[in-house]
Structure formats: C-alpha cells, structure tokens
C-alpha cells in the first residue's frame, strides 16, 4: 500500500483532498466485503425455487491499525479533544464521517486506487503497549451511500 488517507466528504460526493495517515501497521489493512443474501421463493412439489433475488448483506467495511497513535490521530478517528497536547476521550459516542482513500503499491505498471466516498468511522485502542510492541488504534470504516442535500444518492465506492 502506498497511501491510506482521509478527508472531509463533500455534498453527496467524496472528498477532493486527503490527509495521509503517516504510519499504518503492516498486515492490519483488511477488507470486509460481504456477499449479498439470497432470497428464494419456493413452491410445494418444486425442487428448485421458482424465483430468487439478492439483497444487500451486512455493510461492507475495511479496517486498519495505527501504531502508537498521536493525540491528533486519536481525535480524528475516536472523537474527543486534544488539550495541552493530550487526548481526552469524548463523553458520548461520536458520529464521525470521512471519505477514505487507499492506493496500492505499483506492480508491473498497474496501481489501484480505492475511494470510499462516505464512511462511518469507529476506532478503539485494541492493543496495549508492551516491551515488544506499541499500543495500536484499530480503525473500522463502514461504507455508506452518500446523499446530497438535494436527496441525490452518489456512488459509495470507486
């Protein structure tokens, strides 16, 4: 991965500028893209369904880990505030929405860029520091469909 960053979504569209996360722990980027759920209509005496369609399954998401996060990174992804250089957790669960961008490393003249126009962000400290590793902030980005103020739905993913 050559880039993982976040930005402020526009009105029903993805951000146009992204801030790069300086350090993402190796091996922590995981896509959780779910299969649709099949709904079958069956009739007595018929072996196969007479009709079948797919509906959306669980929401798609991806995760990544930031080792030894700074107070500013904790504020971006966990909410709260930074005061006198220290992060203070929010009193209530925050509502955090961001556009996210991931760019793969180039390979044989190919490179893929993933842009998630609108994501629900949730994060937590998932690993405590020890003598052999740092603490780790695990960030989960759940893909949402952006909707403009005029009610027009935009593409959630490109």
Which role does the model predict for each range below?
Residues 42-54, 78-91:
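Short secondary-structure capping micro-motifs at structural edges
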Residues 81-110:
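Short, acidic/charged, Gly/Pro-enriched secondary-structure junctions
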Residues 10, 23, 91, 107, ...:
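Generic low-complexity segments that are intrinsically disordered, proline-rich and/or Lys/Arg-biased
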Residues 110-158:
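Mixed-charge, glycine-accented linear interaction segment located at domain edges/termini
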Residues 13, 36, 85-86, 111:
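Intrinsic-disorder/low-complexity loop/linker signature
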Residues 1-71, 118-134:
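Solvent-exposed edge beta-strands and adjacent loop segments
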Residues 61-65, 99-101, 138-141:
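Beta-strand secondary-structure signal
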Residues 72-76, 150-151:
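Short, conserved charged micro-motifs
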